[in-house]
């Protein structure tokens, strides 16, 4: 053993890492405002939007944010250990796939503001039902400081349930409906996008450059966090206008063939697939969907993949190419225009034969399916 180094012995390295990061985070109580971000979809995007807003208010050196999606019981402690005295804000993304995980993470972070982006069906195979997912996501409330703020979607199925779980501070809601405290309108006329955000008597006009209706809702969530932290309207506007999206999330690329690739390969669950399909459906020209398996669905796997096929057909998608064991169910449900492939090469060759310079190709699947390899191949053609 190298006796010139310091060693810490522990019976549980993960718990040991959590203990050290919790101790380190406590040194910054009353010095840094902490934001915790969780939800079934949009965690990383909302985290990046919030960070952009905070950097517009202060400077990048004063804001610590989770890198990428390091949001588990290793990533969160590693992020907390990067806290430094120059930081004013910390934006910590927290994920989970089983009960108790968020309780563990949020008690380390102790957020002043916690945002639950939405509650969908991600990890339903582990948690058994959407109600179970709601209970697991509500665990983030356990770590909220007294007098903190819980930010939730006003129109979400579990808004009332989540509000009832937090009685030590306030709740701030966001959404499109009139009952949302932070309300937004998306204008996609005249070939461009703009957002109006309403909060009390305040109106903020934002030029918007990010694809997808769901990202409009993500922007409202980020703005609500900004209001909860008393960030200036100027910084909220500038931060959202500077945000240009996250790699692998509805990222559009014009191919040399003239066709448009929609790279949404970062990950996939039922809700995010449906939102991506809705975006594909409003694009001009031929609509091609390359779909890889969705993971962690357990006993719901067959039914949810079938539903993707049905939904794609109902939206007028032209072709569905499935890749993976369960994607075959989507192809069968899609019917005419659906093909299943066991070989990446065969799928790519078939896809290339369908390109005509006017198609939109959406590629999506869970991370383990490596659907990004299809995108890389098309871009390199």
Residue spans of the language-model regions?
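Peripheral docking tails and interdomain loops at the edges
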Residues: 340, 360-379
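ATP-dependent carboxylate/acyl-activation modules
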Residues: 37, 247-249, 368-374
